Amino acid sequence: MAEFKEQVLDILEEVCENDIVKENLDVQLFEEGILDSFAVVSLLVEFQERLDIEVSISDFDRDEWATPNMVIKKLEEIR
């Protein structure tokens, strides 16, 4: 579990190019401008390639993926 969480946070940090995603797991990714629609596509591709978790863009709801903690929770539900 802890390893999975670290992997997700590493991917988030790389795609967002911002280490706040590891420092504050409740930061609002979209409201704070850390993540935008272009980055979401990159994020989903990275999740598929590195974690073997496929999330289609149509299944991505910004309200359910708004913080690093929420991203981890959603991916745990899917995998």
Curated annotation (Swiss-Prot):
One of its GO terms (molecular function) is D-alanyl carrier activity. GO terms for biological process: cell wall organization; lipoteichoic acid biosynthetic process. The modification O-(pantetheine 4'-phosphoryl)serine is found at S37. Pathway: Cell wall biogenesis; lipoteichoic acid biosynthesis. SUPFAM superfamilies: ACP-like. Its main location: cytoplasm. InterPro entries: ACP-like_sf, DltC, PP-bd_ACP. The keyword S-adenosyl-L-methionine does not apply. Keywords: Cell wall biogenesis/degradation, Cytoplasm, Phosphopantetheine, Phosphoprotein. It is found in: Cytoplasm. GO terms for cellular component: cytoplasm. Residues 2-79 form the Carrier domain. 4'-phosphopantetheine is transferred from CoA to a specific serine of apo-DCP. Belongs to the DltC family. NCBIfam families: dltC, PRK05087.1. Carrier protein involved in the D-alanylation of lipoteichoic acid (LTA). The loading of thioester-linked D-alanine onto DltC is catalyzed by D-alanine--D-alanyl carrier protein ligase DltA. The DltC-carried D-alanyl group is further transferred to cell membrane phosphatidylglycerol (PG) by forming an ester bond, probably catalyzed by DltD. D-alanylation of LTA plays an important role in modulating the properties of the cell wall in Gram-positive bacteria, influencing the net charge of the cell wall. This is D-alanyl carrier protein. It comes from Bacillus cereus (strain ATCC 14579 / DSM 31 / CCUG 7414 / JCM 2152 / NBRC 15305 / NCIMB 9373 / NCTC 2599 / NRRL B-3711). The gene is dltC.
